[in-house]
């Protein structure tokens, strides 16, 4: 396939350094799955006896799920479908939409599917910290039941501290993530080898025949077990989502060189332990270690789960930023916590909402076993959407025929469907929680997209063509005042409403006038040579278009200051006034938006509380003049 692109350029870092960094960020979530995956796979509620053949089959199912879903689907297929080196469901959605538009197909169904997959990720972002931290701290119950009442308060304390720390950024402690994660995977491998030595026949689980026999022998019961097996590959989406940070080669090297072998050894070791001692099913992960290592492992597991949670939280920030810049979410205040790494961001509004949702999940479900029922729905749903979007990229973007596109993705779609179906069996037991979170975010995104369309249509109904307006204006030109006026407008060919209001009320025009349009492209970044386009309109008026990718920081002040001399414009920001329109949305029953009245009110609320455009575009507040307009939709 021809979708592979070279790794992102990291001239200051070697492949070894990138691989070490990827271990801490990419593999934190999937690396902590041994804490609960085996325990939940053999949960007595499934009604499958703990006999040797069943244990071999269950462990084999876990190993081959990792092989098929992670090694084959993500590492070999999905990571090729990158958007100029950038991964993640928003980047893939943008790529799929552009691929479909090129051949004249309607993008609406793909947009709906992609946004739903992105919405489900937020359910995962809520459950991952809750599940991971709870399962780590539950290890202290293995040592003594006297500490059991403190597990929940300790988990709440760790999570609150984690979210409160977000505003400081991860630059200071991020360097520790890789080394700590290496120690974690080595500890997984060592314990696994120790367990295998107690029952070497567990190596028979490496054969897929045991997994197939397990599924065929137990029928519907084994189908329900798949809902627990999928816990072994939660976090696989991170391999794709973090491609832009590390490149595909370091991520693949870390997976095949350390992560997959360590996970396989640990799962085999836990299986051997259960065969030797069936009572170990209470907590096979911690019971795999000698008693003297229990509390050090609880501490190490807590550190590993905090790292996993941090990676998920950072992923939610990144997804939200991309969603804002692609126009799927309202503007929020995005704080850059590092001067050197543009990807290290903090979104206060999202952080607060995530913290509340995570605490609700922890206190509401109370244990990792209860959370396990809720965990799988969001993960498998997002994975299915990723595979579907990849099909559209292969077929429409890479121009492979339908048969080859189905051959490449059909098997993985079937596997994803099986896991989605098995996780839906647990909707009543807790699977409803991420579905409610995802549905809520989905409605918010759809409402914002439709509301912005309705607003633009409403504004266009009163638009005046810019060219003809300027021609008539300068037949009897208004007085000119010193300085530069920049009018931000989403439509470069029409007169900005802020200019009309300025002329009506002040009856003057600056000596230099710029009509500025900022366009967000469906690519990760826009080369500096293509960022700005300047068009003289006469009478010292100019039309400027700035282009940014969804991974760029839309810094208008910097972009204007960096205009090449050939453009004929030099900007002194302190001698420039920026005129912005701010629409006050009024929800009107039976308005032109076509939305239900409650959605119109929701859009009006989101619009009213959206982040300030001046802050978002990094325009100095003391150079901004904001003009309000009331609009009914």
From Swiss-Prot:
It holds the Pfam family K_trans. The keyword Chloroplast does not apply. This is Probable potassium transport system protein Kup 2. Keywords: Cell inner membrane, Cell membrane, Ion transport, Membrane, Potassium, Potassium transport, Symport, Transmembrane, Transmembrane helix, Transport. It is a multi-pass membrane protein. GO terms for molecular function: potassium ion transmembrane transporter activity; symporter activity. It comes from the Bacteria. PANTHER family: LOW AFFINITY POTASSIUM TRANSPORT SYSTEM PROTEIN KUP, OSMOTIC STRESS POTASSIUM TRANSPORTER. The gene is kup2. Transport of potassium into the cell. Likely operates as a K(+):H(+) symporter. It catalyses: K(+)(in) + H(+)(in) = K(+)(out) + H(+)(out). The chain crosses the membrane at residues 59-79, 110-130, 145-165, 173-193, 219-239, 256-276, 287-307, 345-365, 374-394, 402-422, 429-449. The lineage of its organism: Bacteria, Pseudomonadati, Pseudomonadota, Betaproteobacteria, Burkholderiales. It comes from Cupriavidus necator (strain ATCC 17699 / DSM 428 / KCTC 22496 / NCIMB 10442 / H16 / Stanier 337) (Ralstonia eutropha). GO terms for cellular component: plasma membrane. Signal peptide: none annotated. Belongs to the HAK/KUP transporter (TC 2.A.72) family. Its main location: membrane.
